[in-house]
Amino acid sequence: MTMMLAFGASWLGAVWFWRSTNRVPATDDLVLYLLVLPLALLAAFWLGRKIYSGISMPAAAATSTAAAQPAAPVAPPRGPSLSLVAAAVRAPHGASPAELGATLAENKARPALDPELNDAYGYPVMSARIADIDADATRTEMSDWLAANHMAPHYSDEQWRALSAGSEVVVELSAYLGAHPLLELHAGQVARREPLSLPMLQLQPVWQADWKPEHRQAAALWFRHLVIQSGWPEDRITVAPERGAVDTEAGTVLARLLSNEPPALAMLVTCGSHLGTGSVERLENGGALFSANLPQGQIPGEGAAGLLLTDALQATLLGTGGEHPQLLAVSSGRLPHSADQSKRANAELLQELSAKALHDAGREASAIALISADTDHRTSRVMELMGVASEATPQLDPGVDIFSVGASCGNCGAVTWLTALAVARQEAESRKAVILCISNLDPFRRDVAVIGPAAAVPV
């Protein structure tokens, strides 16, 4: 009801004002009055409720002085963890996790009217575009390599944009591997046929759902080629086997990596772009493209993100003088019905997954310093995220301590959440605190990850 009142009052007031003044609203007006204003009203309501609860709770506690003193809480056992040695992103509002995190903190990152794409009525669509992607250079270099290796997949223009961003991420992460101290020993061990000390690098791509098998296979081999070009031995890298639809779910891939027998060294990378005529037409034909008439539609985005994950030994060998943030736990689930079709937001599943992830990580919700999410501007997703924040982390300020990557960088499938994870790693490192990373962009799938700092955090 609160959500309906906030959005209803804002929209009706804006429409009445524009009609009474005979004014045609600009794009900034649409974003401000149809999105920003109602969300600000909701945030103010939640903040007021939190302040009221903080005042009333001590008074309620004073009425039960006879209660027995509770025993000190026992920290739940922790499962396996992986060190997040490095992260890389290419996003519309940042070419690194630190740059993107700073922009999100300033609340200045917003989509804009696209300079190239129009809807069916000829109006520019709202998008989140990376300005400096050099797709032509990637197309030329990769096409020559594909021809030399007898592969000829047909990539669309938007796929070339994705591959350009993804290639930059792979090259950046590969540079960290060059510091491995066992690289110099490897060639000698191979020549002498001795047991190899250098670990096997597992390259794990996460794909867009509409990429065909031939697109995925060629791109995976291209990324492998880039890692080898950066100096990593060809015999110490393997591409994870294809698993079909599972390869589009970053949460499933992370959970598998975070198993009882995690790999010693893994590179997780994803890339995508929805900034093409085909993607815009699909969204528009499905009644899912954001416009002035459909403010709950999706805003297409693009980008790439990657993580370099290792066990404790490899993290020490690759260390740069300090320890690394940890991926402590991942919890995933599916909604019984599409969130796009539900009449009201339901945060129950996301709350359960958050509680489970925190339990598996051995952390309390009170230790969380920030939430990094792939949530976009849509009311259903915002309300779901705020439902988790208000229940599990009342200590957080929704306007300051929650980063919504999707609202700033648009919708780009797995890229959006992996970008949020990269930002979470950066914040865990800089704040030396626990970060909760949430995914609720998909209509059905929900994921929660817990990122911890290098040092132990009191629970």
Where are these regions (language model features)?
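Conserved "HGTGT" condensation-loop signature of ketosynthase/thiolase-family condensing enzymes
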Residues: 1-263, 270-272, 283-459
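Active-site-adjacent substructure of cysteine-protease-like catalytic cores
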Residues: 274-279
